[in-house]
Every structure is written in structure tokens, then in C-alpha cells.
Regions:
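Glycine-centered small-residue hotspots that permit tight backbone geometry or close packing
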Residues: 11-13, 126, 151
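A phosphate-binding catalytic loop at a beta-strand-loop-alpha-helix junction
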Residues: 119-130
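Bacterial N-terminal signal peptides
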Residues: 6-18
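Positively charged n-region of N-terminal signal peptides that target proteins for export
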Residues: 1-5
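Cys-dependent protein tyrosine phosphatase-like superfamily
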Residues: 19-119, 133-170
């Protein structure tokens, strides 16, 4: 199993070497160890869990920052240690599927706007990360329907979409 993980990581590194030099995040099929990975912009990606070999793949593809939206009981302490040991910046803004508060969105805004790029925003599945991305885009003035579509593409599911609509679309 370790051999397979090492092989997958090396394969990912090989495929994404040109992107590392450009400072752009890779497309989804190019970052295998990160679940439900999607490219939101040239500098920002959104995903679910970072799997075995995922932190190494992030480093190899040029990522500088990880914004983790999971709660402490989802393993954030271990991930923080791995990410920081690899030389990346780590932010944790714990949130649940209960919705996004103004305080959480403010903390996210501060994190994303101060982050070194490229940046990965993630949670357990991509649902919360997609919802946070959509909420941020709405607050920044993007057309709400376009922001929600971006959130859906990143993994936001209907129950979280409704919470985003209720909280941030007036």
C-alpha cells in the first residue's frame, strides 16, 4: 500500500511539474491524493480531504497555503502539523453544515486575502468549502447565481446552498 501511495505521489508530481513553475493550481485530474479536488481560479483550488501523500503533492505543485474548514474532531491538529512541517501556511476556520456565520466569513475573508497563493480551501468533502467560496464571492459582489454555481462546481450540495442563500442573498 505504501508503494502505491508513493507511486501515485510521484506520478502526480511528474504530471504537474509545469504548473509548479507557473504558480497556477493544477486541474482536478492532476492532483490524485486530494479528494473531490476542483480548480476554482488559477490561484485557488477547493477540495475535500487531503489523503495520504496529499500534502507532498500540494508542495510539489506549488501550493503555499491551506485553509481548512473542518472542526477539531475531524483531525485538524494532525493536518496542521503535516502542512506546517512541509513549509505551507495553515489556517483553520472550523465550521459545520449548520451554516456559515458572519464571523466565519470574516475570518475566511481575512485568511484568503492574506494567503500566499496558490491556496487550497478544503473541508471533509468539498461541501462546506464550496459553500464558503460561494459566500465569499457573493460578499465580494459577484452575481449571486454565478457565485452559487461556482460553489456547486466546487462541491457545495443543496442543503448548504440553501443556507448560503438564507444568510448572504438578500
Amino acid at each position: 500500500m505504501k508503494y502505491l501511495i508513493t507511486l501515485m505521489t510521484l506520478f502526480t508530481i511528474f504530471l504537474t511539474l509545469p504548473l509548479h513553475a507557473s504558480g497556477r493550481v493544477p486541474f482536478g485530474h492532476q492532483l490524485i491524493p486530494v479528494q473531490n479536488y476542483s480548480r476554482a481560479t488559477e490561484q485557488i483550488a477547493i477540495s475535500g480531504l487531503i489523503g495520504d501523500g496529499g500534502v507532498q503533492a500540494l508542495v510539489a505543485t506549488g501550493f503555499k497555503t491551506v485553509i481548512d474548514l473542518r472542526t477539531a474532531n475531524e483531525g485538524t491538529a494532525d493536518e496542521k502539523a503535516l502542512v506546517e512541517r512541509a513549509g505551507l501556511t495553515y489556517f483553520n476556520i472550523p465550521m459545520t453544515v449548520a451554516g456559515i456565520s458572519e464571523e466565519q466569513l470574516a475570518a475566511f475573508t481575512q485568511a484568503i486575502e492574506s494567503a500566499q497563493m496558490p491556496t487550497l480551501i478544503h473541508c471533509g468533502s468539498g461541501n462546506r468549502a464550496g459553500a464558503m467560496w460561494a459566500s465569499y464571492q457573493i460578499k465580494k459582489g459577484m452575481d449571486p447565481e454565478a457565485a452559487l454555481e461556482a460553489g456547486r462546481k466546487a462541491g457545495m450540495r443543496p442543503p448548504m446552498e440553501e443556507k448560503v442563500r438564507e444568510s448572504f442573498i438578500r
